[in-house]
Amino acid sequence: MDLYNNIAEVMQKKGINCVVGDIYDLQQVCKSWYRGNVNDFHNYTQTLVDGSICEVERLTMSMPKKICEDMQKLTWTEKVDISLDTKKKTEQLWKILDSKENSFTINFPAFLERVYALGTGVLVEFIKDGKTIIDYIDGDLMIPYKYTNTYINGLITISQFVEQKGKDKLYYTHLTFHEFENNKYTKYNELYLSKTLGELGKEVDFATKFPDIENPKIYDGVDTPHFQVIRTPIANNFDMNSPMGIPIIANHIDKFKSIDTKYDSFMNEFELGKKMVLVDRTAVKGGKEVDASGNVRDVSYFDKKNKVFVAVNGMENQPVKEIDFKLRTSEHIDAINADLNYLSAGLGLGAGFYKFDGNSLKTATEVISENSEAFRTKRNYETVVKDVVYDL
């Protein structure tokens, strides 16, 4: 967040008002859930009965990742047809789209999934070595500065790289300005250098690192810019003054916590609920034996890796005691499914879209009727996807 504010402060001095707000904090929260590992939740400390503290990992169903995957599959498939008015033009188009550099068939669905995870993304096209290149840029690497409602026609994309100079590391931040107005697309670059990670630093001559890039680059008389912003089609209730979209998982963090808490408990049920046999501690002590060669060695009368037998004090002259816990699997499964129904309904997919059977997670993507909630949500998301592909 400091870098975004740092950029905004520097740009304000140049008369450019960047929109930062709270959206980038939200993106980082959602990104950690999308990755499936949230600090202080999936990794936490626990105090044991003896007062010692141990680190514990909470298991996850990875629902944020699953949701973004499924929404991508609902709104974009390999059956989508992109064609121009002639067969020859269509072939030329696909030659560009599915070049080794662009690999649109593979990269666009992955990009779309990340858009759903972060709320926003941008495609940028440029020429490199005579080839048209598509850059798939995530929403946390762009800052809008010119927009009308949710239509963004001025933005900054961010890229960073590091150089080693002796014992020091030099952190470079490359800012690219994209602006489209009055049928003119302008692309301008700035370069900043810092010795501290996360800071913008001071502006340096862009040409020192990129001498072959024309700067600025102006395209006059164009109908569309060489960039397309895509955002989720849901209202931004976290930062209502921002033109950025919000992650589709943003309003469901509490549900993810509830699901993972129950799932972790469900999996622990099989570990903690295992059959145990209590024996006196003296019964598991080893002894000394003489082998065939006359050597004395220590032997254990119990397999140390055997978790069934548990040694306790105070059971002298008592028979072994068997404890067999009753597993609460059905209660856990029902509780998880109740949360999944609440979650899928909140996503606009309808209750019952997800179902956990104890072994795997089932998804009702096979048949979606035209009058279902999931179908209407699918159509809503398809609209923004079609718009960005059409402009591309």
Describe the residue ranges of each PLM region:
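Extended, helix-rich architectural segments
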Residues: 1-153
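A preference for well-ordered globular domain cores
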Residues: 390-392
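Short secondary-structure junctions and interdomain/linker hinges
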Residues: 18, 36-37, 74, 78, ...
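Extended, charged amphipathic alpha-helical segments
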Residues: 210-369
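Extended, regular secondary-structure scaffolds
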Residues: 117, 122-246
